Structures are given as C-alpha cells and as structure tokens.
Amino acid sequence: MDLAGLLKSQFLCHLVFCYVFIASGLIINTIQLFTLLLWPINKQLFRKINCRLSYCISSQLVMLLEWWSGTECTIFTDPRAYLKYGKENAIVVLNHKFEIDFLCGWSLSERFGLLGGSKVLAKKELAYVPIIGWMWYFTEMVFCSRKWEQDRKTVATSLQHLRDYPEKYFFLIHCEGTRFTEKKHEISMQVARAKGLPRLKHHLLPRTKGFAITVRSLRNVVSAVYDCTLNFRNNENPTLLGVLNGKKYHADLYVRRIPLEDIPEDDDECSAWLHKLYQEKDAFQEEYYRTGTFPETPMVPPRRPWTLVNWLFWASLVLYPFFQFLVSMIRSGSSLTLASFILVFFVASVGVRWMIGVTEIDKGSAYGNSGSKQKLND
C-alpha cells in the first residue's frame, strides 16, 4: 500500500469526513427549516433554494466516491441518447445489488448536473433520519410505507406535486424494492414460479405497482425512462467502507433511453412491460459476467469539480472552530475536559461505524426476506 492509500485508511481521516458531514448537514438542515417561511409566499423559490442546499449535502458523499476513492464509472449507451442526458426529466431504473449502487446513481446525476434536484422513492422511516432524511423531506422526496393500500394515494399525491418542479431531475427508483441477497432471491423466484414468470438469475422480481404509478403520475413531465444496469469489473465487491478507505472501484453502467410514450398507459400492460424489462436486464448482466462488457459505446462523462469545491468550503468552515476548541481544551489540562473529549471521540467512532453498517448487505432491510402474500399481490 502506498503512502496515500495508508493515509486514506486511517480512522482519523474517517472521523474528519464524518464530522464535516454531520456539522455541515445540521447547519444546512437548520437553514432548510427557515426556508419553510418561503413556501406560502413563493413555492418555486423555496424549491430552487432547497435544491441547492440539498446539493451541499449529497455532493459530499459523491465527492468521496469520485475524488477520495477515485472510482471510475464508464457508461455504455447509444451516443444519440447520450446527448439528451441532463437536458430532460427522466425516471432512472437501477438494479439494487451493490452496497454503493445508490452512490453510483447519485454520481450519474452529478455528472449530468442534476444531483441537487434528483428524487428517489424511499421508505418513509428515512424521512426522520437527521441530515439525509431531513434533506429529502425539504426537497419533496417521495416516501412510501411499502404497504400498497397506504401508498396508493400518498405516493400518487407526492408525485403529482413534482409535475411543476422548476428544476430538471432524475427520479431514481429501485423496482426490486430491496437489495439483492441470495435468500431474498430464492423467495422472489418462488413468487415468480407461482406467477408463471421466467426465472431471473441476477435480479429480484420487480415490484410493478410503484413503477406503474410513477409513470402514470409523471407522464408528459418526464421524457424517458433510463434503464440502468450496474456492475463492477473483475468481480469487485464495492462497499462504503472501501470507498471511505480510498479504495478505487471500476463501475460499468449500461444505460438505455426508452421514450415514455413507448411505455403502456394501462397498469397491467405497464406491469408486463416492466417484467420484460427485467428479463432483458438479467440477460445483459449474464452477458457482462461472460464477456466483461456491456453493449453499446463506452463513454466516461467528465468529473465535475463542484463536489470537491463544496466539501472544501464546508470543511474550512466547520473544522477551523473545531480545532480551535480542541487546542483550548488540551491547553486547559483539565482531566474532566480530556475525559469528555475521549467520550466524544468514542461516540463519534461508534457513529461512523453505524453509518457504514446500515449500508452493508448482510445488515440490510428484511423487506423481501419473508414471503409471499404481499409479493403475489404486487
């Protein structure tokens, strides 16, 4: 390991990233709270401000991926479709197999200048998580309870609110509903057999109702669906801890642009269309494992400097007073003060490990591990 790699793996560096993220995130959340005063006066101004405040938070995680770890992402796509990326609203359908696939989705949004306005379909519990969840709340993310009878109206209402959103955006959705594991895959394929659907080797059975209502609600606002199939070269198994340690990964992303008018308007036909899409995605993954590449022309969108500039700004803003406080604490020589600092250090280290742990596949959501009644209804 070279000197830079050794430095990046040090826990002290991880604590610095964690401190900057938490301190700046709470400051930004506070500013977002005050922007609520704008909502009844000028809703579009509220949205534009929060779009940029959101970028200040989410771009810090993208910075870790693109600048700290140096992860490279090659896009395989039709050159004619490539010219439209970033210039239109789109629904992005991404497979959900890797611990950092959400970061790769954000990186895709960032490369085309749409990170601040990008949306996700997320479970409603995340709305209560400080920093990320609160940021999502202020940027009108769509939250679901994963119970269709409850989500039918609430998700549709939230999506309708996005029809007059003033910024371009990617709406990222994992139609599988949960991250791929062997156990979830086995259960999912039992459902596929019960429904008479072809077996998928590399994906879970897609949840069609959420996709259908998204397409129906955003029709004539969103121009296309971007079918994105992600994999990593040389059987790399990327993790957030690896990114934090500065490990470089090599992502390949196959992107197909499908005009929204090509997707059926009828819900049942739309569901059948999505199942066919996932059968095609599965074939693309199988071909990737066989040949090491995707179809179409490989392209590397340029890495933009703004994620790094944003992090350096917030780091200089919050680290200077912290180090001043730390120096004054050490100079005081008080055993109680030093004990308090050690306690804070310990709590921070536990916090860092917890934040990393929630992204790990073996500690992921239990959704999809049980059974069948709900899946048969999807």
Curated annotation (Swiss-Prot):
Locations listed in the record? Endoplasmic reticulum membrane
Q: In the UniProt record, which is one GO cellular component term? A: endoplasmic reticulum membrane
Which regions span the lipid bilayer? 11-31, 125-145, 307-327, 338-358
What is recorded about the protein's domains? The HXXXXD motif is essential for acyltransferase activity and may constitute the binding site for the phosphate moiety of the glycerol-3-phosphate.
Q: Does the keyword rRNA-binding apply?
A: no
Q: Can you supply a Gene Ontology BP term from the record?
A: CDP-diacylglycerol biosynthetic process
**Which GO-annotated molecular functions does the record name?**
1-acylglycerol-3-phosphate O-acyltransferase activity
* EC number(s) given by UniProt: 2.3.1.51
Protein name, as recorded? 1-acyl-sn-glycerol-3-phosphate acyltransferase delta
Ranked from the top, the taxonomy reads: Eukaryota, Metazoa, Chordata, Craniata, Vertebrata
Quickly give the catalysed reaction: a 1-acyl-sn-glycero-3-phosphate + an acyl-CoA = a 1,2-diacyl-sn-glycero-3-phosphate + CoA; (4Z,7Z,10Z,13Z,16Z,19Z)-docosahexaenoyl-CoA + 1-hexadecanoyl-sn-glycero-3-phosphate = 1-hexadecanoyl-2-(4Z,7Z,10Z,13Z,16Z,19Z-docosahexaenoyl)-sn-glycero-3-phosphate + CoA; 1-octadecanoyl-sn-glycero-3-phosphate + (9Z,12Z)-octadecadienoyl-CoA = 1-octadecanoyl-2-(9Z,12Z-octadecadienoyl)-sn-glycero-3-phosphate + CoA; 1-octadecanoyl-sn-glycero-3-phosphate + (4Z,7Z,10Z,13Z,16Z,19Z)-docosahexaenoyl-CoA = 1-octadecanoyl-2-(4Z,7Z,10Z,13Z,16Z,19Z-docosahexaenoyl)-sn-glycero-3-phosphate + CoA
The domain of life is Eukaryota
Q: How does it sit in the membrane?
A: Multi-pass membrane protein
Keywords tagged on the record = Acyltransferase, Endoplasmic reticulum, Lipid biosynthesis, Lipid metabolism, Membrane, Phospholipid biosynthesis, Phospholipid metabolism, Transferase, Transmembrane, Transmembrane helix
